Amino acid sequence: MSRKMFSCDFETTTKLDDCRVWAYGYMEIGNLDNYKIGNSLDEFMQWVMEIQADLYFHNLKFDGAFIVNWLEQHGFKWSNEGLPNTYNTIISKMGQWYMIDICFGYKGKRKLHTVIYDSLKKLPFPVKKIAKDFQLPLLKGDIDYHTERPVGHEITPEEYEYIKNDIEIIARALDIQFKQGLDRMTAGSDSLKGFKDILSTKKFNKVFPKLSLPMDKEIRKAYRGGFTWLNDKYKEKEIGEGMVFDVNSLYPSQMYSRPLPYGAPIVFQGKYEKDEQYPLYIQRIRFEFELKEGYIPTIQIKKNPFFKGNEYLKNSGVEPVELYLTNVDLELIQEHYELYNVEYIDGFKFREKTGLFKDFIDKWTYVKTHEEGAKKQLAKLMLNSLYGKFASNPDVTGKVPYLKDDGSLGFRVGDEEYKDPVYTPMGVFITAWARFTTITAAQACYDRIIYCDTDSIHLTGTEVPEIIKDIVDPKKLGYWAHESTFKRAKYLRQKTYIQDIYVKEVDGKLKECSPDEATTTKFSVKCAGMTDTIKKKVTFDNFAVGFSSMGKPKPVQVNGGVVLVDSVFTIK
């Protein structure tokens, strides 16, 4: 018999000296009439012991702290051996919560346990966005979190409806996922399973063999993220009219059309020599460099005390640098920089194939373009979650919670633990091709480029640039979508900018449009780490390095659980 599954949520107090759950809610996934809303954590945990089901909280890192705190204070201890009256967790070294597995004992050989998962790992969006994007027949509401609610507080009709909506939105969304066969712990795992189902597990294991941990560690040194760069020419200055374009499904489009590695790599010494059987390669290289005039910098060096980790470099400084580079990255660097004192050390070479992901991407692109609501959003999730799964870190050493003397949770690093890599070379080359796509387009617009962010280019002026004029389309895979045209803008740093965007009213909503069609402008604030509350205080006049405001919630572990303390946010 399959286990029942429930969507759950807590509402909690906001005082450091009175941290507790004042309301809980649970609703059965696939049976929305089976739900309950109550006001006692003890009552909820009694139900958890009796139900022995799979529960989902949206952002388990927050709600899970109250559960683990309760378990510790009621005699349960952490253990990964499945002993009675113990609990196990999956919490990453970065503090991401994935699971709590509470074992109550055994009936014969059958384990009596309740497993709690994080629905945010399957649906990585706020509840309000899930309701909107999935076109669910209810929307997330609002309540005043700071209202006094003493122990035994009687839940008001408004609070009851708010909690019920929250758990129902997630219950409906997860039910849709599960009915599509998407039943893994994370969106990435769902996507990888879907790809294996199309390719077949047998062929997957042959095409993407397991590499040794030492080899994976070396190859992983060539793995880099998206290209995010602000042109110094426009930094901290108000800019006039401009345009923003972004690539439709950047990573899936590279997976669809670019030559990508497969099979076991071959190690080579020195400089890579052309090999038609193994045309893709990762080169370990030591060199000095100087940016050419009129070129965008593309070299970024992390975990090095001589360089800022988020800065793209114009020169190598006083000493040569050593990098692991795909042939895609290396060719781009050779075009953008003068290289000196080059030493080719060694590397890995790979067979190549185009179209490995064609059937998978065709399937989900069709759903994305022909469906609306939930199915469309699930298709986007499947398309965008796969590439990163290939480069999953095999080091899965986690954190273990424990109860400190003051009653709050502490965390220690657990025993070292590793899993098999998936196939890191694939993640390395997909991201390399993605950077190549964005950088090549930006470089062709060198006289206009303001800013790049992974899949987007921001340009001065209102003319479509020559390099993309024939590949502009709002939906086609790999084409550039014209996202917006702005009247004015100001960029301070990566992921920190504001724009007045030209808009017009369509069916009662403001839609981006050209300057000629515009009836007004919409003020847009993009700033990593800034809450919506603080964004409402931003203007063109005060948006600058040093801008400071209260309104950033900072989680603090206290006796009983977690309190979100109001703290200062500053643009640095």
Curated annotation (Swiss-Prot):
GO terms for biological process: DNA replication; viral DNA genome replication. Mg(2+) 2 binds at residues 246-247, 453, 455. The keyword Iron-sulfur does not apply. The record marks 90 as: Involved in binding template-primer structures. The record marks 526 as: Stabilizes the primer-terminus at the polymerization active site and contributes to the coordination between the exonuclease and polymerazation activities. Residues 1-222 are annotated as: 3'-5' exonuclease and strand displacement activities. Mg(2+) 1 binds at residues 142, 166. The record marks 251, 380, 387 as: Probably involved in nucleotide binding selection. Its cofactor is Mg(2+). SUPFAM superfamilies: DNA/RNA polymerases, Ribonuclease H-like. Residues 223-226 are annotated as: DNA-binding. Residues 227-572 are annotated as: Initiation, polymerization and pyrophosphorolytic activities. 5-methyl-UTP binds at residues 251, 368, 380, 455. The record marks 9, 11, 62, 119-120 as: Essential for 3'-5' exonucleolysis. The keyword Nucleotide-binding applies. This DNA polymerase requires a protein as a primer. Polymerase responsible for protein-primed viral DNA replication by strand displacement with high processivity and fidelity. PANTHER family: DNA POLYMERASE, DNA-DIRECTED DNA POLYMERASE. Interacts with the primer terminal protein; this interaction allows the initiation of TP-primed DNA replication at both viral DNA ends. Interacts with DNA. Belongs to the DNA polymerase type-B family. This is DNA polymerase. The gene is G.
